From Swiss-Prot:
It is found in: Secreted. This is GDSL esterase/lipase At1g28650. Its main location: secreted. GO terms for molecular function: hydrolase activity, acting on ester bonds. It holds the Pfam family Lipase_GDSL. The lineage of its organism: Eukaryota, Viridiplantae, Streptophyta, Embryophyta, Tracheophyta. It comes from Arabidopsis thaliana (Mouse-ear cress). InterPro entries: GDSL, SGNH_hydro_sf, SGNH_plant_lipase-like. The active site is at 44 (nucleophile), 347, 350. Keywords: Glycoprotein, Hydrolase, Lipid degradation, Lipid metabolism, Secreted, Signal. Belongs to the 'GDSL' lipolytic enzyme family.
Amino acid sequence: MTTTLLMASLIVSFLLILYYTTIVVASSESRCRRYKSIISFGDSIADTGNYVHLSNVNNLPQAAFLPYGESFFHPPSGRYSDGRLVIDFIAEFLGLPYVPPYFGSQNVSFNQGINFAVYGATALDRAFLVKQGIKSDFTNISLSVQLNTFKQILPNLCASSTRDCREMLGDSLILMGEIGGNDYNYPFFEGKSINEIKELVPLIIKAISSAIVDLIDLGGKTFLVPGNFPIGCSTAYLTLFQTATVEHDPFTGCIPWLNKFGEHHNEQLKIELKQLQKLYPHVNIIYADYYNSLYGLFQEPAKYGFKNRPLAACCGVGGQYNFTIGKECGENGVSYCQNPSEYVNWDGYHLTEATYQKMAQGLLNGRYTTPAFDWSCLGSYDFSG
């Protein structure tokens, strides 16, 4: 009897050890991956050329011309910056090529990355926004359109790869944006009230969440999901709401109530991502804190190599912030600074390469990601960009 109990106890102990070992190994494998590709969705913050390719050749957007791209790409690549974006610095760190835009690309391999992000894109469909009285004239390539396009071409992507579809997605870092910012930008710039705009928050969060679930069902395992920016520090927003009565933070010069709105979106997004993580424990859903990774640059610009005037645009003209709505970067009579690396803001709406590099470093080293990336399987790694 004693022998039987002893054997049973040993068997139970062995099974428990095996169980917990399996859990640890599975967790380790889901955390640290040698990503073989990047799949990207979003708007101009991640657009590597889609909007330019989608545009009429006789009416190309400003990002198709200098000074866009003047710090790195020569000629312009269609990125809304003077150079590289966060997605580019992540690709460099992973040893992958810059992620090519899907739309308009010819004779391009997507085996190591594909990008559907489009300037002006929204999380919510254009038709829905129009019904709410919100104009969205830049593009109809919303998040759902990007995702459906990806689903349609997925069989072809897998056919050109040695991996099956689920394996391909599992080996990819999936970048979900930034997306949702334009859903707020349009109504803010159209004069909608803060209460009207707040009603969109749960709908936008749901759209992002639903897209993640769809990609999980297809085999996605690692998602980097950015939050919103501190829009109260945006050159364009500071110009839009520039009145004698508007309250500014005495330390940064930003508009507090706009930043609180961005924080509200981010808190709701984090709550949703936590719920998704509980539902899909085998998946790694990483929140990218774009808000604080950028806000620190406004708090201590000199510490990060920027001028002590971080709210002004490098490329622009007029006003307190070197920016005038309707007379913007790339247009006749609009100049740009000779040292973009000393500026946080590029064109009033978008950021400089130097800013995106600092943000990417903060994401990759884990300071601004929850949970932090685990790079232990890579051996040595460098976050300097």
